[in-house]
Amino acid sequence: MYKQIAIALSTFLAFTSASLFAQSPTKGQAQNWHQWRGPYSTGVSLTANPPTEWSESKNIKWKVKIDGAGSSTPIVWEDSVYLLTAINTKVVDPEKPRPEDQPMRVFGIKHPNTFYDFFVLCLDRETGKEKWRQKTIRKVPHEGHHGDNDFASASPVTDGKRLYCWFGSAGFYCFDLNGKALWKRDLGLAHMGASLGEGCSPTLHDDKLVIVRDHQRQSSIEVLDAESGQTIWKSEREEGNAWATPVVIKHSGRTQVITAASNRIRSYDLYSGEIIWECGGLTGNVTPCPVIQGDNVICMSGYKGHSVMSVPLSSKGDITDSGVVTWKQTRGTPYVPSPVLYDGLLFFNQSNSSIWTCLDANSGDTLMDRTRLPGIANIYSSPVAAADRIYVTGRNGQTLVLGKSKELKVIASNKLDE
């Protein structure tokens, strides 16, 4: 099985510059794409200028095949691209039940009985050639995953000194940027409801790594020291399945870690683990990542209902149904993709469909209401934006280039044969 990366000047690798919407990254981070959703967790670059047109023969800089499967986003630091993959060795563990002997599960999910190799890869950004690879572990995963997921779903993160790679129940691994192993941690097994698979990415701030594990047993949030990998604090959470990567923001003298989940949106103090505030109001299986707009955080969900809400960062305690929430809407929100926040405009799709909405991020007013995007039907990937354009890719390989506009403006439509 192969995962193929087709990198044009129009793709993710072009988005390697600064944004102004959330916490201030370091100078190096601002000039790179060092984590999931970029340096400001919004999916936006303010200075990149990717092309609007490409095809199999136009504006493709390089293309390489990657063994295995991994739905995590590659990250970029200077001249290197880092990504994760899990390769099925097809070597059978005779002590594990065969898939055909297992009970019927929802979505036909089977637990594997073969060993997987979990790899970290580094590619040359200019040529696509492999610079190094490191195998972190060989093991049989304890659970299966949904057909749209895999065993390498969390995106790596770097501070320019070290590379942090999270394979969920297969472990947390740290390397220097030349591939030298520095530390590793086994944080235990997660038991996802319906065996849907893991997917929350780590967040890095002030030499601290944040890991949220919301699943069907004891959910938790854990903060590790980035240099040593040792746990600084860990707090249990009452949550079911969720895959939303947290966002970190300093506000009013405190550094808040904001997590979105079905029972509560919560703000934790990064250094102590204290809950600063919490608020109910999202639906289940929360996957979209929070974004920061001014003095508010915007969270959303789109599974078995729709909810998007803007919560003041100055909140204290449990503010559920208190009237403190700045604004809320209950339609058109995404299930899997995260939103784009661009110059005060909040763009997102409905569920996993191609129905497109734009809100005023400050007021919550609807500027473009559930408008169908042409040429694509299903959307799982999160959109990215630059140069007053938004790039939305469907599962059929079609990418629409949209204008950053309160009305639908299609600039171009491009397809790769992947």
Language-model features, listed with the residues they occupy:
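Low-complexity, intrinsically disordered regions enriched in charged/polar residues
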Residues: 3, 14-15, 27
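Bacterial N-terminal signal peptides that target proteins for export
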Residues: 1-9
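Noncatalytic, solvent-exposed loop/strand surfaces
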Residues: 21-418
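Bacterial N-terminal signal peptides
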Residues: 8-19
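Short, aromatic- and cysteine-enriched interfacial helices/patches
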Residues: 2, 20-21
